[in-house]
Amino acid sequence: MHFETVIGLEVHVELKTDSKMFSPSPAHFGAEPNSNTNVIDLAYPGVLPVVNKRAVDWAMRAAMALNMEIATESKFDRKNYFYPDNPKAYQISQFDQPIGENGYIDIEVDGETKRIGITRLHMEEDAGKSTHKGEYSLVDLNRQGTPLIEIVSEPDIRSPKEAYAYLEKLRSIIQYTGVSDVKMEEGSLRCDANISLRPYGQEKFGTKAELKNLNSFNYVRKGLEYEEKRQEEELLSGGEIGQETRRFDESTGKTILMRVKEGSDDYRYFPEPDIVPLYIDDAWKERVRQTIPELPDERKAKYVNELGLPAYDAHVLTLTKEMSDFFESTIEHGADVKLTSNWLMGGVNEYLNKNQVELLDTKLTPENLAGMIKLIEDGTMSSKIAKKVFPELAAKGGNAKQIMEDNGLVQISDEATLLKFVNEALDNNEQSVEDYKNGKGKAMGFLVGQIMKASKGQANPQLVNQLLKQELDKR
């Protein structure tokens, strides 16, 4: 790269309150189009908004978890624009007095910790949803008025990889606070990215482009990587970067010009006359602060310092509260800490990715996973057998030992039976026997593999190693 990359992210998070930001309508995902609306959402003349106090509490909780200063006085403003899914022709947002400012989160990239500043967190209402179908469009106002918080980072991010790490950490923190389920596929987390380039050593920022239609963390990274390359090529060829909004095209992996970017003046912000300012005293702040649960960094430190897990394991296990809670419940049922960590990061994650399901959508429970891990610990079940048992355990639930027995996968621990497999392997692989005698350690591993293959993975591996060494020493 001939230039330094400067990235800032704007993340919208939908709060999972029961009702909307300024109306009593339900704020649930997945209802029939236009069924979760009332006269306030539809902007009937004369109706007045009423602030949802729980949404304010949750915005404060999120801001505190992000190490932000909470405003003593915060007000709402009108952001004026016309669009079919915005019935009032303005959005109630916050302009110059947001509820939270001056925060930060720490991210890890390539083994190094970096602090990313957060400029502000403000509250606003969501717009409806437009669906374009050929020559006509459909509008669903269920989402209109849903409470949002917008979290704006400082331009401290220097690469697409750092942007990805920031989003992962931000999502994790918000999920732990319980104020949102932060599911991109359901629209409860959305991200716009601003990116510009400047010569190394220059303090002044370059002209930025805003990227939209970033529907996954991978698309955020890919969109930024493409835009980084596009801007560099443009600057090196003597061209100029325009301040514009661009859309990421998932099929081509490129960004496409949407429009010349608007500034904040185009929205003609002014104070919302129908909502009085919020006055937040210390007692209110303290009440909210007491509701903040254990956050990912605290759990991570606990897993390393108290449970003895490697930092990498602790990082992976705490990425989502769902996985972290499952891990803690499993070891509470008596499963070995490291074995549980290995299974959650390995076999469990592989199963979830392969079947495109969430952990809580499976039949797996901390109790039945702990049961399987204890069978591995005491030698009743080998790792190979566990890999065959696990998919059924996750899909149907039940008991790992019963699944093993029902499928004829019981581990062979009878010495006489195992000796037959051992001697057969030795007779069929005389060269490996010679290699072992000549000090080649790999020969032992090869012979164990042959025995496990012959027994269809059901031989007790510890006993196999013991008997194999015993028989080799006789030859």
Swiss-Prot record:
Catalysed conversion reaction: L-glutamyl-tRNA(Gln) + L-glutamine + ATP + H2O = L-glutaminyl-tRNA(Gln) + L-glutamate + ADP + phosphate + H(+); L-aspartyl-tRNA(Asn) + L-glutamine + ATP + H2O = L-asparaginyl-tRNA(Asn) + L-glutamate + ADP + phosphate + 2 H(+)
Function: Allows the formation of correctly charged Asn-tRNA(Asn) or Gln-tRNA(Gln) through the transamidation of misacylated Asp-tRNA(Asn) or Glu-tRNA(Gln) in organisms which lack either or both of asparaginyl-tRNA or glutaminyl-tRNA synthetases. The reaction takes place in the presence of glutamine and ATP through an activated phospho-Asp-tRNA(Asn) or phospho-Glu-tRNA(Gln).
InterPro entries found in the cross-reference section: Asn/Gln-tRNA_amidoTrfase_suB/E, Asn/Gln-tRNA_Trfase_suB/E_cat, Asn/Gln_amidotransferase, Asn/Gln_tRNA_amidoTrase-B-like, GatB, GatB_C_1, GatB_Yqey_C_2, Gln-tRNA_amidoTrfase_suB_CS
Name of this protein: Aspartyl/glutamyl-tRNA(Asn/Gln) amidotransferase subunit B
Subunit structure of this chain's protein: Heterotrimer of A, B and C subunits.
Pfam families: GatB_N (PF02934), GatB_Yqey (PF02637)
Record-stated family: Belongs to the GatB/GatE family. GatB subfamily.
The gene coding this protein: gatB
EC annotation from Swiss-Prot or TrEMBL: 6.3.5.-
Classification via PANTHER family: GLUTAMYL-TRNA GLN AMIDOTRANSFERASE SUBUNIT B MITOCHONDRIAL AND PROKARYOTIC PET112-RELATED (PTHR11659), GLUTAMYL-TRNA(GLN) AMIDOTRANSFERASE SUBUNIT B, MITOCHONDRIAL (PTHR11659:SF0)
